[in-house]
């Protein structure tokens, strides 16, 4: 019984992707594929927004939607599974009217509500943000250190990391601190992962010593 429901959702998502653009228009595929229910909704929205040249506008509106849904009062009325559907629809209608979202964003919200998928909204926003990040040529990079880096060291690190990027790519750097790594740093850039932490070095040394003994 579950398969037809999923199929129905997929059909509605595909319909959403073409309902606001001319019929039979070719689907614009996002620069990166995101799987799951959230990925299907985000892909349909990306295609529709791309055709209307409103990707940036929709991205801003989705971030606003995510922000609104985090508000306790809104979450209590919209995301609570025990609240009647009619009340959720009324709350969403009020929000849409107040924010004056574009038809693209409005259609997405209404479709999520209709399919009982409002709990997936944050995931859809995240998936769409990922697509937009790749669309802009951004390369995510996370650097974890035991203590905050000095400004000069951070500047030097950025220069080194940028040297690994291709032309047109943009470094999207996030620096975190985690005292448990004890020293050194852990770098994740794109699909690459390099662990130069003191903690890992100590673990490797400990393992090597045990093997010798």
Curated annotation (Swiss-Prot):
Residues 1-23 form a transit peptide. One of its GO terms (biological process) is proton motive force-driven mitochondrial ATP synthesis. A motif (SIFI-degron) lies at residues 5-23. The keyword Mitochondrion applies. Pfam families: OSCP. HAMAP family: ATP_synth_delta_bact. Subunit OSCP, of the mitochondrial membrane ATP synthase complex (F(1)F(0) ATP synthase or Complex V) that produces ATP from ADP in the presence of a proton gradient across the membrane which is generated by electron transport complexes of the respiratory chain. ATP synthase complex consist of a soluble F(1) head domain - the catalytic core - and a membrane F(1) domain - the membrane proton channel. These two domains are linked by a central stalk rotating inside the F(1) region and a stationary peripheral stalk. Belongs to the ATPase delta chain family. NCBIfam families: ATP_synt_delta. This is ATP synthase peripheral stalk subunit OSCP, mitochondrial.
